[in-house]
Amino acid sequence: MGQQPAKSMDVRRIEGGELLLNQLAGRMIPKGTVTWSGKFPTIDHLLDHVQTMEEVNTLQQQGAWPAGAGRRLGLTNPTPHETPQPQWTPEEDQKAREAFRRYQEERPPETTTIAPTSPTPWKLQPGDDPLLENKSLLETHPLYQNPEPAVPVIKTPPLKKKKMPGTFGGILAGLIGLLVSFFLLIKILEILRRLDWWWISLSSPKGKMQCAFQDTGAQISQHYVGSCPWGCPGFLWTYLRLFIIFLLILLVAAGLLYLTDNMSIILEKLQWESVSVLFSSISSLLPSDQKSLVALMFGLLLIWMTSSSATQTLVTLTQLATLSVLFYKN
C-alpha cells in the first residue's frame, strides 16, 4: 500500500528536463509589478530574458535535451537523428564507374571556341548623331581641339628654397670678426707684456723690480714694473714700451719680407700644402650649419674664460684654427 511503481530512467530524464525548463522559463516571465507604472518590463527582466534564451540556445545546439523534454518549448525532436550515409557495394560501384565511362565516350566533342575579339574603338563621328551634324561646331570648340587627359594633371609652381636672410649672415660675420679681433688683441698684448717683462728683467737688477712711480704720492698699492694699474704714472710708460716693441716686431717682419722679395718663399718654407691638407681635414669635421658653428665658438669662449693659462692657449689655437678653416672653406 502506498507504494508507487519505480520510474524508468527515460521518465526520470524527461522530468529532470522539464524541471530545468521550468527554472529557466521562470525568469522570462515577469512577476509582480513590472515597473513603477506597471506597463513595461524593467531592464533587469530584459537582461534575464536575454541570458535565459542564450542558455536555452546553447543547450539546444549542444544536443543536451533529453528525449521528450522539449515539448514545453514546442521542440518535438530536439536531437534530430543524423542522415544515414549511403553504402555502396563493390558491384554497384563498378556499375557506376562503367556508366560514367560510357557517358564520357558517347559524349559529343566540344565545339571549338572562337577567341574573343577586341572591341573596336568607338569614335564620335558627326554623321552618327543628328545633333552633331554641324562639323564646324566640333572643330571650333576648344575642348574638341585640345581634349583634356583622362587623369587631370595639376601643375604647381616649383617651391623656392628658403635662403637664409642676409641679416643673419651679416650678424654672424660681424660676430666672427669681433671674436677674431678680440682674441688677436688679447694674445698680442700677452706676447708684448712677456717681451716687456723680459726686457725689464735684462735691464734692471732682480731686487729693483718694484715700480718707481708708486712712491710719487698716489694712493696705489705696491706693484711690479710692467703691471701698473690705471692711475699710476707708469701706466702710460708701460703701454709706450709695448707700442715700441710692437713697432720693432713689425719692422723685423717687414725686413724679412723685403729680404725674401716674395712671400711665396716663406709659404713654401712653412709647407703650405700640408697646412691646407690639415685645414681641409678639420673642415670635414666641422658642422655645416652656421648656428652650430656659433654654438661651438661660444662654448670655446666659455672654456677659455674659465680655464688656466695652458688651457686658454690650447683653446685659442683651436679657435684660430676653426676660424681659419671657415675662411678657407669660403
From Swiss-Prot:
Sequence segments annotated as region (Disordered): 68-125
Question: Does the keyword Membrane belong to this entry?
Answer: yes
Main location group: virion
- What PTMs does it carry? Myristoylation contributes importantly to DHBV infectivity. It is most likely required for an early step of the life cycle involving the entry or uncoating of virus particles.
Give the location in the cell: Virion membrane
Q: Which intervals carry biased composition (Polar residues)?
A: 76-88
Q: Region TM1: start and end of each range?
A: 166-186
Locate the region TM3: 293-313
Write down the superkingdom of origin.
Viruses
Site positions for Cleavage: 240-241
Disulfide linkage:
none
Q: Where is this region: TM2?
A: 239-259
Q: Which residues lie on this side of the membrane: Extracellular?
A: 2-165, 260-292
Gene Ontology CC: one annotated term: virion membrane
Region (Pre-S) location: 2-163
Pull the Cytoplasmic topological domain ranges from the record. 2-238, 187-238, 314-330
Q: Which family does it belong to?
A: Belongs to the avihepadnavirus major surface antigen family.
Give the protein's biological function: The large envelope protein exists in two topological conformations, one which is termed 'external' or Le-HBsAg and the other 'internal' or Li-HBsAg. In its external conformation the protein attaches the virus to cell receptors and thereby initiating infection. This interaction determines the species specificity and liver tropism. The large envelope protein probably also assumes fusion between virion and host membranes. In its internal conformation the protein plays a role in virion morphogenesis and mediates the contact with the nucleocapsid like a matrix protein.
Q: What is this protein called?
A: Large envelope protein
**Record organism:** Duck hepatitis B virus (isolate Shanghai/DHBVQCA34) (DHBV)
Q: Which gene encodes it?
A: S
